[in-house]
Regions:
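Extracytoplasmic/periplasmic ligand-capture domains
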Residues: 25-63, 72-73, 131-135, 148-149, ...
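N-terminal lobe/hinge region of extracytoplasmic solute-binding protein
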Residues: 67, 71-151, 182
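Glycine-rich and polybasic anion-binding loops at the starts of cofactor/ligand-binding domains
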Residues: 642
Length: 683
């Protein structure tokens, strides 16, 4: 008797008594036609027993006919057992939008480069403990089967799926979550500093594992937003202990000896080769980072729970195949994903990427596209047999100044709020909207929260946004920044020549936006130059405190801020996003031992962020703390907002079960709410 049959007997008996009907094969229901099947507890998905009860059926499982071939391409994977032994006892049943899919095909993606412009493609295979449903309001199970909070939001318990397996067939258990937290997320030998989502008011949690299917997060103080953080964050709170743990010296006394067999100095070097000393899930694998050692290693990449896994990686791109142990099925019992392969190619030139989209050489793209690309894509969508959606965004283009510049004269200037106010009102947002965004956007100040929550005074997002070049000039005059040599451009208050150098990457902001803003600043006498660089060059300069100006999109929904306070703590976001105040961050991280002490308003904002996260959702306390955060953000204009406008989502019409997105946004992790494991290719 199989595991499935054993669990089925109980549910079948109960349901047949209620319905008075015989069991049958499960019907091919879709969201477009549910065939009388009642909705489940969560939108578009059921646990197996719940679906069988609702549909009055007994599910028979089937797999991709290519799956053994695909499995053979995954280095280190053994031969496959039967499908029922590869699925958990309660697989997640996904109801497709429009049609039951067919297997096969290759999803073609394009990114800027390794770790650059990749998150839209990453999200296609992404999983986490939970996710947001496509309404972007409802948190639903994903890897976890269920969850439960205690009364004061200081303990969050997850139930995992019994029998769930990693992509190499090893059991996935609560130990893999604890390994991620204790031995990776909190281990400074692996990740230098714990990320904000892994802490509660800057203090660590503890993780208990009462049994293989139960994970308990114990919080030092309330953090109701922790669940939403899991639903949106790119990082995955589980790692294969059975594999990576072998190379961790805290878990295996022979870790360094094992690593030395393949030419690594320590076991931690092997973990770095696989995991990258980062929680970003597309850091280069050993196939790219350690080509001379990868043949010796047991696997080319560490096992995953995602829908697809890497099999090849070069500087030109990457290839993936379907995970033969993936935990989702469709209503007829077909194991997901439908699509057998994924190919990602790199093109850092924006014009090259657009041309490939126009020619139909890419199946899905949203990241690094700007509204400026919309006309040519819309003009060609019928001929090219693709669809372009203009969807609302959450983040908007923002600018910042290096308030801890190594150049002391610049540091003093950039740290002066009057300078930042002047540079904000120097921007003609209405013209910027018409020129760069075809009049489709809304001029706004950056307030961190997006969309604007009800607890924020609408006037807050208007602070220092009214175009006032004369006022900007007067403010610059007032801080002693005047033109002393008659060349039309202002010198520093001490009289030294000043040129504002703006470097930008099209992954983070449109070139047309940067060019216009630079012209507005030059128009009020601040000489500004512009240079496009690669995302890697931009991030490297930002990390080394070498940028004059930060230029990248920014903004997060309330649900994310409830779980991650990075927008209010120096450097005010992560490595892949928009940062400033790098030496403030060093001071915070070192508890004042090094770096530069931030001003009091920054320290107050950090405390208010803790208060916001610790308050009950919807409470007066939360509203008051949130309003203070938004006001402080706008008043101090550390980040200057511009225009919030819709942006482009592209997909080829051959990609089926592709629905309209509520937003074009990284903040809900792009495709993750829309279950791309249901996509299939039909030419």
């Amino acid at each position: 008797m199989t595991r499935h049959t054993r669990t089925l007997l109980l549910s079948a008996a109960a349901t047949c008594l209620m319905a008075g009907t015989a069991w049958a094969e499960c019907k091919p229901v879709t969201m477009a036609d549910m065939g009388g099947v009642a909705p489940g507890d969560f939108p578009q998905q059921y646990d197996l027993s719940a679906f069988e009860a609702a549909a009055g059926c007994e599910m028979t499982f089937s797999a991709n006919p290519e799956i053994e071939t695909l499995n053979a391409e995954i280095k280190g994977n053994p031969d496959l057992p039967p499908l029922e032994e590869r699925l958990p006892e309660e697989p997640l049943v996904v109801v497709p939008y429009d049609a039951i899919g067919t297997y096969g095909g290759t999803l073609r993606a394009i990114s800027n480069a390794t770790e650059a412009g990749t998150s839209d493609f990453l999200s296609v295979r992404h999983v986490n403990l939970v996710r947001y449903a496509d309404d972007l309001q409802t948190i639903v199970p994903n890897v976890a089967k269920s969850w439960e909070w205690n009364d004061d939001f200081t303990q969050l318990t997850f139930k995992l799926r019994k029998g769930h397996k990693w992509s190499d067939g090893a059991p996935f258990t609560s130990a893999d979550v604890k390994f991620w937290y204790d031995n990776i997320a909190l281990d400074s030998k692996v990740i230098e500093k714990p990320k904000g989502y892994a802490l509660v008011a800057d203090k660590p949690m503890t993780v208990d594992t009462p049994d293989d299917e139960t994970v308990v997060f114990n919080l030092p103080s309330p953090k109701p937003g922790l669940l939403a953080s899991f639903a949106t964050v790119y990082a995955q709170p589980f790692l294969p202990k059975h594999f990576l743990g072998e190379y961790h010296p805290d878990l295996n006394a022979d870790a360094d000896t094992l690593a030395a067999e393949c030419g690594f100095a320590t076991g931690l070097e092997v973990i770095s080769a696989y995991y990258g000393n980062s929680d970003w899930t597309d850091t280069p694998t050993p196939m790219l980072k350690n080509p001379d050692q990868v043949d010796c290693l047991p696997k080319s990449t560490y096992p995953t729970l995602e829908s697809h896994i890497y099999t090849a990686e070069t500087t030109e791109g990457r290839k993936l195949v379907a995970n033969p142990y993936f935990f989702m099925v469709d209503p007829t019992g077909q194991q997901l994903p439908y699509i057998s392969r994924q190919d990602e190619t790199y093109a850092n030139d924006n014009e090259v990427r657009i041309l490939k989209l126009v020619n139909g050489e890419v199946d899905y793209k949203s990241q690094s596209l700007t509204l400026a690309a919309a006309p040519i894509l819309l003009e060609n969508q019928e001929k090219g047999n693709f669809t372009v959606q203009l969807a609302p965004t959450i983040a908007m283009p923002t600018f910042s100044f290096n308030v801890t510049s190594e150049d002391m004269a610049k540091r003093e200037l950039f740290g002066n709020v009057e300078f930042r106010k002047a540079m904000s009102v120097a921007i003609n947002r209405d013209e910027l909207n018409e020129t760069a965004f075809f009049g489709q956007g809304v001029p706004k100040q950056f307030i961190a929260f997006s969309p604007t929550p009800s607890f924020v005074d609408p006037e807050t997002e208007k602070m220092y946004t009214e175009y006032d070049p004369d006022g900007a000039k007067a403010m610059l005059d007032g801080i002693g920044m005047v033109d002393t040599d008659g060349d039309g451009f202002r010198e520093l208050p001490g009289g030294a020549k000043f040129v504002l150098n703006v470097q930008f990457a099209t992954q983070g902001i449109g070139g047309e936006v940067v060019e216009l803003v630079a012209q507005y600043w030059s128009d009020v006498g601040v000489q500004t130059t512009v240079k496009e660089v690669t995302p890697d060059e931009y991030r490297s300069a930002q990390s080394s405190n070498q940028l004059d100006v930060g230029a990248w999109e920014k903004g997060q929904p309330t649900a994310i801020i409830m779980g991650n306070k990075e927008l209010f703590v120096p450097p005010f976001e992560n490595y892949f996003a928009h940062r400033t105040g790098m030496l403030w961050a060093e001071w915070v991280d070192s508890n004042g031992a090094s770096g530069v002490e931030p001003p009091e308003w920054v320290k107050t904002m950090m405390a208010d962020a803790d208060a916001f996260q610790g308050a009950m959702p919807g409470s007066d306390e939360q509203a008051a703390a949130g309003a203070k955060l938004a006001k402080a953000t706008a008043e101090n204009v550390l980040f200057i907002g511009t225009v919030q406008a819709p942006n482009v989502i592209y997909h080829r019409n051959a990609v089926k079960n592709f629905t309209e997105f509520k937003t074009q946004s990284y903040e809900y992790y792009r495709t993750f709410p829309y279950l791309p494991a249901q996509w299939f290719i039909q030419e």
